Amino acid sequence: MPGPMGGGRRRQMGAKPKVKNPGKILGRILGYTFKNYKIHMIIVFICIIVSVLANVQGTLFIQSLIDDYITPLMNTSSPDFTPLLFAMARVAGFYLLGAASTFAYSKLMVYVTQGTMRNLRIDIFSHMESLPIKFFDTHSHGDIMSVYTNDIDTLRQMISQSMVQLFSSTITIVSVLVSMISISIPLTLLTLVMVAVMFIVSGKIGGKSSKYFTAQQDDLGKVNGYIEEMMNGQKVVKVFNHESKAVEEFNELNDKLFDSAYNANKFANILMPINAQLGNISYVLCAIVGGVLAFNHFAGLTLGGLVAFMTFNKNFSQPINQISMQLNSIIMALAGADRIFKLLDEKPEEDDGYVNLVNAKIVDGKIEPSEERTGVWAWKHTHSEDGATEYRQLKGDLVMDDVDFGYTDDKMVLHNIDLYAKPGQKIAFVGSTGAGKTTITNLINRFYDIQDGKIRYDGININKIKKADLRRSLGIVLQETHLFTDTVMENIRYGRLDATDEEVIAAAKLANADSFIRKLPHGYDTVLTGDGGNLSQGQRQMLAIARAAVANPPALILDEATSSIDTRTEKIVQDGMDKLMKGRTTFVIAHRLSTVRNSDCIIVLEHGRIIEKGTHEQLIEQKGKYYQLYTGKTA
């Protein structure tokens, strides 16, 4: 469905409504649970078995209590209640043991469940951080957030409740069935007939609700994704007066969620009452038939045996009802787990690079590694042939040689890109929106890999450079600056986490940010919230420049860094940028062409191709596309 401005939204996770391989998914869930809590789970299962057997034994002893203690006392003129009291204490002991075991495994399961959820969240987040930029460009952020909230929560409920209940109910059914057979085979057969009816009903209703529970999780993710998208784009929505359109689209998604949730819970909620009524019918039938059998002493059935059997009858139908109830929770949890594991199964960003970036020093004209920050950087290249290590100084020389690129293999967006940036040069990319300016910088960072051609950094194919080291060598200042909920000091320090306070302040001064920072309520200790919403766009960009400055990178990428601020602020920001760019190879993308006049080379792009290249003066003389963009006139 199109977004509020007609474009398609990012695709959602878990697009197919049916969970594939539920057994495999359940196995992975159990694997996560047992991985760190094997001993705890063994104790839990032992406690469950003890609890069930204690309760069954207590119920089974009721037969002896009535037949061997209560009935004889009724025919005695001077009864001695001492044996009865001891027998009652024995029954109470069984039930107390069962209660203690239940308390123990319930408390343990809280610890196991929360620990498993903690580990799972860590694994999800760690894996998410290893994913390529392409994943976040093609998936709804709100849908990803739904994995951390809704899907994790449904899985938590399954592990803490459904899994334990399923095991407990299974043990209860088996032990109760054996006990019922020992009391009366005819009544047991009657009970099993009613149980068979329950299973048939549960299968029919459960089958209908299964697909809707899966769809419910997917639709919930879509609603969350849309809300997140609209919150981020609220200014755009209001500028274009698309509030009613946004509400209309939200209602459409919300209605789909209503339909799937209604259908899922409609079938799920009628399952327990139906099974409860079938259980009541089974109880009444067994009471009538059992009364007749006990009255006639058929097959050795006594009054005590009948009372015990009727208790077991209730205990037998109850776990079956619980299983049918938990099956719906398990189905929902499997749908959530499916989305979780789809995220975990996303392929991490590949990195086959082996050239590292290291601090270096020059000794007798030679490059050597240094343990300290010297301001000199070098590429450490260990040759696989002979194991020799070569150090090559990082100068910022970058070459793109006949590069072709497409976000998909069947549609190229860059064609035959050739450029050469000498160390310390300022290279500017200009062109219409969608011409390919930002795409080129994404290739330099290796956020995406090219289909054809070569990109060399200081003569080294960038595919050979480890991505983390490549990106460490490139400072980035984006138009949309992302600030974290933390102090101004820590937001700047994010550029280099081991930077001292003095280095952070020096970087802020270089970016011309120091003066406005000191006017904030708590200066550098002011906590920014809401992505720095209380700062102006210019102030946010100054912090971005300071963040890049504290990293002290050898090269820079300035992506449309001053296209949305006023002229006065732009001069302040531009002055900070000029200080930052000094002595560094810099790639600039700007809508205000006045900011790139002093570039060493201006590259004009159109439809993914370089159509002009040269200095400002040279391009003005050519009176081509750049001339049109700069002057607004046609040659």
Q: Residue locations for each model-derived region?
A:
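Helix-loop junctions and hydrophobic alpha-helical segments within the transmembrane domains
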Residues: 124, 128, 237, 340, ...
